[in-house]
């Protein structure tokens, strides 16, 4: 072959001075633009093998998950391993998160049938109401009746008292009357009839309608001192105790619906009953509780 027509092999890039520089096997950032040479990415067998290995691992993982799903299709999936969830604390260790306390449900204290206090509360006051069935002139009643007072600026009713039974009546212009102070149901009814007869003698067509006992108050003594602080702590849903405001503990019983005033001396006042039996039942319910908080000196 002719040497003039032969093309010498590429040895490098021409410098501005026309001399040859050593051959450059890879793309260099020093290569000037517009030379007509386009760099090509270098591919190695190692990079291809890594990609193939990753694809193969992904395929194996997908196959294994599909097989597990087919085998466990009839079972409930678990988000956590059953061994990682334990409810009992490890021996010797205190659980970090104590279980929340269950709110207390108000329960009426019950008394065992075999236990009896042997104490009978005494009735101290009975409040009853009656309708006289006619309109009344309170000024006329106050002027003509004995033991009657009327001050409309202070209270819009005539206050009348009798000695036997020793009671007090509140007489309103509408014809309604409230009788207080009796010690028994019979005394309350008798006193209300006497007040109605007084109004009749003054010239009013008074009747005796709808007599009803509205409230009964009883009291007793358990004969031992009581720790009121301990009682209010264990029966918070029933009781309230503010010694700076009132020296007694207020206990609101659910059944029967009675309010008890309990004092540290052992005295107990029961109020809110409609019949005498509710007073007795409420005291029998509270007595074993009071025995549990007996103050020992």
UniProtKB/Swiss-Prot annotation:
The keyword Phosphoprotein applies. Gene3D superfamilies: TATA-Binding Protein (3.30.310.10). Coiled coil: none annotated. GO terms for biological process: DNA-templated transcription initiation; embryo development ending in birth or egg hatching; transcription by RNA polymerase II; transcription by RNA polymerase III. It comes from the Eukaryota. Residues 56-78, 104-114 have a biased composition (Low complexity). Residues 52-116 are annotated as: Disordered. The N-terminal domain is extensively phosphorylated. InterPro entries: TBP (IPR000814), TBP_CS (IPR030491), TBP_dom_sf (IPR012295), TBP_eukaryotic (IPR033710). GO terms for cellular component: nucleus; transcription factor TFIID complex. Its main location: nucleus. It is found in: Nucleus. Pfam families: TBP. Keywords: Developmental protein, DNA-binding, Nucleus, Phosphoprotein, Repeat, Transcription, Transcription regulation. One of its GO terms (molecular function) is RNA polymerase III general transcription initiation factor activity. CDD domains: TBP_eukaryotes. Sequence repeats lie at residues 123-199, 213-290. HAMAP family: TATA_bind_prot_arch. General transcription factor that functions at the core of the DNA-binding multiprotein factor TFIID. Binding of TFIID to the TATA box is the initial transcriptional step of the pre-initiation complex (PIC), playing a role in the activation of eukaryotic genes transcribed by RNA polymerase II. Members of the TBP family are differentially required to regulate transcription and development during early embryogenesis. Binds to the promoters of select genes. Belongs to the TFIID complex together with the TBP-associated factors (TAFs). Binds DNA as monomer. Belongs to the TBP family. This is TATA-box-binding protein. It comes from Xenopus tropicalis (Western clawed frog).
């Amino acid at each position: 072959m002719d040497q003039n027509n032969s093309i010498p092999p590429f040895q490098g890039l021409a410098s501005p001075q026309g001399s040859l520089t050593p051959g450059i096997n890879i793309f260099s950032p020093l290569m000037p633009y517009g030379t007509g040479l386009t760099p090509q990415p270098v591919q190695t067998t190692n990079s291809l093998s890594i990609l193939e290995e990753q694809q193969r691992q992904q395929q194996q993982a997908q196959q294994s998950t599909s097989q597990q799903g087919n085998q466990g299709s009839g079972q409930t999936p678990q988000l956590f391993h059953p061994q990682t969830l334990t409810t009992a604390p490890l021996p010797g260790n205190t659980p970090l998160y104590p279980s929340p306390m269950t709110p207390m449900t108000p329960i009426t204290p019950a008394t065992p049938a075999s236990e009896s206090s042997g104490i009978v509360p005494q009735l101290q006051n009975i409040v009853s109401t009656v309708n006289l069935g006619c309109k009344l002139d309170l000024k006329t009643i106050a002027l003509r009746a004995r033991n009657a007072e009327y001050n409309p600026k202070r209270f819009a009713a005539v206050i009348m008292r009798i000695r036997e039974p020793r009671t007090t009546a509140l007489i309103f212009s509408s014809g309604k009357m409230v009788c207080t102070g009796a010690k028994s149901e019979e005394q309350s009814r008798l006193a209300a009839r006497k007040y109605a007869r007084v109004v009749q003698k003054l010239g009013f067509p008074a009747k005796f309608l709808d007599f009803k006992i509205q409230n009964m108050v009883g009291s007793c003594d358990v004969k031992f001192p009581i720790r009121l602080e301990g009682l209010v702590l264990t029966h918070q849903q029933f009781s309230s105790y503010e010694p700076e405001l009132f020296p007694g503990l207020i206990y609101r019983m659910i059944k029967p619906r009675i309010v008890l005033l309990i004092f540290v001396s052992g005295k107990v006042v029961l109020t809110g009953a409609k019949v005498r039996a509710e007073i007795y039942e409420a005291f029998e319910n509270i007595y074993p509780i009071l025995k549990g908080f007996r103050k020992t000196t």
